[in-house]
Amino acid sequence: MTTTSPTTQRRQPAAAALLVDFGGVLTVPLERAFGALSVESGLDPRTALRLLATHEGARTALGEHEVGRLDDEGFEDALAAAIAEVGGRVEARGLLARLAHHLDLDEPMVDLVREVRAAGVPVALVSNSLGRDCYARVDLDELFDVTVISGQVGVRKPSRQIYRIACERLGVDPGQCVLVDDLEHNLVGAARLDIRGIHHRTADETIPRVRAALGLPTTTAA
């Protein structure tokens, strides 16, 4: 009787393309930015995100904004109204710009995208919209071969259609792609197209997993 050691078991072939989320993956966690907005409004740090999940007006506005049916100002008005209902003090106009101000880049993750693209692996941004200033800190053309932003294509994650669009624009079969996202339900949606998923928590965890999935060296020269 023979046995196969874990190190000799067949591995998945390397993925041919990378799909990557923006907020919470290439930036600090969204909870941090929304927490700062909540505190500035005189509320508990968890309030703004809770309202987006539970307040009918704010939740509906977010969904409409993400698919491009509600502009920045309309979303700002809805979220500001929800914040005011629970006793917060916030100026609606410029709310999204202030939120973007708190959305600092996670530089090691941004550098990973540069590394992957420099290695010849096509990279697509697949992101749900969050205001016109959301991507102001990065050069999208430098980092990505393709950008698929929900408000521009009329469909949002976790719908399979947004991932189909990204794969079609890259010219790569979905089964040859890997997606990095900080939200589990977005990964579940992509998995329905056989897109592999990496649940992002920290750069230290994600970077070696992305390199391994793409068949890239697991370490880089200092």
Q: Would you name each region that the model predicts?
A:
Residues S127:
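Conserved phosphate-coupling serine/threonine residues in phosphotransfer and NTP-handling enzymes
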Residues T3, T8-V110, A118, L130, ...:
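N-terminal helical cap/lid subdomain that shapes the substrate entry/recognition surface
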Residues T2-V20, R114, L130-A222:
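Asp-based, Mg2+/Mn2+-dependent phosphohydrolase catalytic module
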Residues R69-L70, V121, Q152, G171:
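Residue-level recognition of short, well-ordered coil/turn positions
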Residues V113-V116, P122:
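Conserved, well-ordered alpha-helix/loop/beta-strand core segments that scaffold catalytic motifs
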Residues G120-V121, I195:
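A generic structural motif
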Residues A119-G120, L143:
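Structured helix-beta-strand junction loops
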